[in-house]
Amino acid sequence: MGSTSSLYAAIDLGSNSFHMLVVREVAGSIQTLTRIKRKVRLAAGLNSENALSNEAMERGWQCLRLFAERLQDIPPSQIRVVATATLRLAVNAGDFIAKAQEILGCPVQVISGEEEARLIYQGVAHTTGGADQRLVVDIGGASTELVTGTGAQTTSLFSLSMGCVTWLERYFADRNLGQENFDAAEKAARKVLRPVADELRYHGWKVCVGASGTVQALQEIMMAQGMDERITLEKLQQLKQRAIHCGRLEELEIDGLTLERALVFPSGLAILIAIFTELNIQCMTLAGGALREGLVYGMLHLAVEQDIRSRTLRNIQRRFMIDIDQAQRVAKVAANFFDQVESEWHLEAISRDLLISACQLHEIGLSVDFKQAPQHAAYLVRNLDLPGFTPAQKKLLATLLLNQTNPVDLSSLHQQNAVPPRVAEQLCRLLRLAIIFASRRRDDLVPEMTLQANHELLTLTLPQGWLTQHPLGKEIIDQESQWQSYVHWPLEVH
């Protein structure tokens, strides 16, 4: 039997769903082994006196019996079970918890809203890339957490009494998706937010990250509809109009919205619109992890790395035995090219980061086979867990690696939605050229080059006589010029 001492479990008894995460510690990082989620909708079982109904408690216990089976193999000191908003509120929470502990065979801790917010922030800090100074938003079933912080350190923590289940029962009880129900839900949410808005704004943020089912649902809708993954107020308003158009909750149909998420989607959407409006949020992306990841990393006592993406790339390079020196060499050439065309092409810093990440992983396909290495690389990157990269960024990396050599598949570059299609094409061109000029695998054999962009025309200037002295190099560059010309990317080499 394999060792179980490296296994850890985190269980979150939420107001809408119960979740279990089982992971294995591998070289200072975590590998997910099991994720189980059950819609228990505990908050829906609270009556006006805040007593949980027997039916709701039974749904919860039934779910925990499933979880208990998986926990038998894990040391009790490596299991954490926490309960959140509904069990903070319920007057008979003690009855539920006593039986829950009996079923699971380990303690269940009811955590405060502030502790929940802190753990959510830790989960985000360990798993989400981007700028250091962030605002984290988590809309749960009965509470919403809002946290600001820098790096691993929180600067303000709030847990507010509103959630997608309680707002559903309160403002969409008639299952009618009319404008007036949305207005009432948003107005109430803004009223709850108002007392904390000033302090959140005072601490400020460079990026806003969402870590809940509502945000996950939005991400799935946007991916299904081919939009980019950034959540904006404009997109939220469009989705609200779509919901209003559907008329009733049971008739709610939006491309990419699963049946499972549909019930609490309008109420979560109303809360999110209120948050965007009240805090003047420009855009939000999906977090890589939240409460359960915060619990796991807390048990492991792992420090938050400054750059999650770098840690991920290092781990993948080690695991697939990628030649790190060569990856760095290609990255250096690509960065040099990027810096020379950045202003002409109006490229953003995130595009540079993603290009460098593609360089770091470009030879991963060789770990499968030289034949079809780009296809293997794309498959691996698309399917690996890459903390710090969003789903759309993973798709872009996979697409760049698929097109690192050979004829270009333009449609694949247009099907990703992390960056505009034109930017994906530009990054692809730079990656392909960087790989060619670093192919001798020695720093002293990379020529001094200048690259100029004039609209779509790239002009590459090499040292005098270089093409004559390097007949194989010339042949490869001629072939590359031809491949780029097939997709209307003009490339001149002197």
Curated annotation (Swiss-Prot):
Gene3D superfamilies in UniProt: 3.30.420.40, Exopolyphosphatase. Domain 2, Hypothetical protein af1432
InterPro entries with a match to the protein in the record: ATPase_NBD, GppA/Ppx_hydrolase, Guo-5TP_3DP_PyrP, Ppx_GppA_C, Ppx_GppA_N, PyroPPase_GppA_Ppx
Record key words, sorted: Hydrolase
Protein's UniProt keywords contain Hydrolase: yes
EC assignment: 3.6.1.40
GO molecular function: guanosine-5'-triphosphate,3'-diphosphate diphosphatase activity
Recorded family membership: Belongs to the GppA/Ppx family. GppA subfamily.
Protein name: Guanosine-5'-triphosphate,3'-diphosphate pyrophosphatase
The organism of origin for this protein: Escherichia coli O7:K1 (strain IAI39 / ExPEC)
